[in-house]
């Protein structure tokens, strides 16, 4: 590591005093998090931090801060930071597709080739025409509305849609009322372009008598210059339309699925660099193959205030490549902590400590799912080749189950009727549905491996990766508690050869299993142990810990004993991570032990009501809205934070270090009723 980039921690050592830490934990309901609600059997309704190895602080001597995070979804805003360091915002919702000239090989009569005519998998079937949502059907350009009556125009567009999706096969013609002058060449060009941009697989032409006709495109009747659709995409700038996705209180994958259904394309045509939190306001980049900006812009419903889908699209551009998981530098967070009653000087002390020293780079609770049964516990069974145990956990009754989910799971356990249970179970329960459907078809309810393998491959991969994260969390807690905040001999750092980049391995986003990418594993060693004569050349911020795998090395000190001890609890061996099943033969990876927020700033504001919005969103800015807040006047106090984290770090873990507050959603919900009552 170069000395000019080296930043050492202050010489004043942060004292690891577990007795004081325990008092802070107990005061906030974090000690063993035993206060988490449970059902009559004692099973907790949700996982807590200690369940997944999160039980240490970098600076445990700081006081706790009483406050609530994510009280409103607008209290948690996330903006992607692209690979060039630009913060991604939604600033322009207009599509600016140019009309292509004849020089590109396009003529007045041209097919409308795009990816909309690709096959759609069964679970992504677009609605039939009668089910089609109004926002998916385009409207005629303004230049044509003056000559084509509204009723005729609407009927023509509906016919175009039916022809495009195959509900009708005969060519259609645009019949204008008598005494209506024929369209001139410019108007016909606009109409050709409109059809090309909005409907797939159609060819429009003007006959000698002036009749405008549209038919299904056949390769046979395409001019040679137009058989290669890349000609027009090249003129636009590339085959991939990149855009910014702004969403409110929705999952990234949920939004992508909705976009795919509305456009009638497979979800695989869309790509992102990473998912963003559901409960929040977020903006990120998305790329889609062979769909033009003008089609995407139709999904905005024409109104910011009446966006029916919970998301908006904009900032369109065309590029020659898609996005891959990890194609970002990080994320910028804007966070509100409400109902802060801790003295201001204590809050400032805690936040300055976070700013200066950072936090333990734990995998947050999101990594382990939202259920009371963590994905890592299923991962253990898989690594043990205990297929029955894994399947039983997936189908286990859980205290948080309600409605049709509870009914279906209870029915399965009382009758073992897979077919009847499957009829009740919502399709969104993908893993459970896959298992029951397999058994319903085969009738062999002892084929646990076969049933598990029917779960989509990418979802299956989440389980063993979650166990890796669990082990990492446990070891990180021990490392900070027992070896402190200085490097010691045998700690691992990135090798100069790898330049701080971990070896390539399958990337799994627990919120986006369909986006798992198989990347080649590097043959180069990406980490090395610190030798005795170079300990002073490194700081605690250089230390990395491995995620267990067949291609990693482990610390050359007592930390390795902790890996063995933790994994021995599950009868697993960190030095024996190869498996016959490629999916379970994990290569491993490396992760920084500590992370410091970049560009961190915070402010105190006053407010009167918990429903009051305290930070502006991109949507607010597009609507020219403003928020009136004061630093002096108001019934309650809130703290607003702004900082940037690398893509692999969790903002909730940064907040945990500063606030000493449990970040589990269930713990936060328990704080809400009293606060809401007090705000009335």
From Swiss-Prot:
InterPro entries: PsdUridine_synth_cat_dom_sf (IPR020103), PsdUridine_synth_TruD (IPR001656), PsdUridine_synth_TruD_CS (IPR020119), PsdUridine_synth_TruD_insert (IPR011760), TruD_catalytic (IPR042214). GO terms for biological process: enzyme-directed rRNA pseudouridine synthesis; mRNA processing; pseudouridine synthesis; RNA splicing; snRNA pseudouridine synthesis; tRNA pseudouridine synthesis. It is found in: Nucleus; Cytoplasm. Keywords: Cytoplasm, Isomerase, mRNA processing, mRNA splicing, Nucleus, Ribosome biogenesis, rRNA processing, tRNA processing. Residues 206-216 have a biased composition (Polar residues). PANTHER family: PSEUDOURIDYLATE SYNTHASE PUS7L, TRNA PSEUDOURIDINE SYNTHASE D. Belongs to the pseudouridine synthase TruD family. This is Multisubstrate pseudouridine synthase 7. It comes from Schizosaccharomyces pombe (strain 972 / ATCC 24843) (Fission yeast). The lineage of its organism: Eukaryota, Fungi, Dikarya, Ascomycota, Taphrinomycotina.
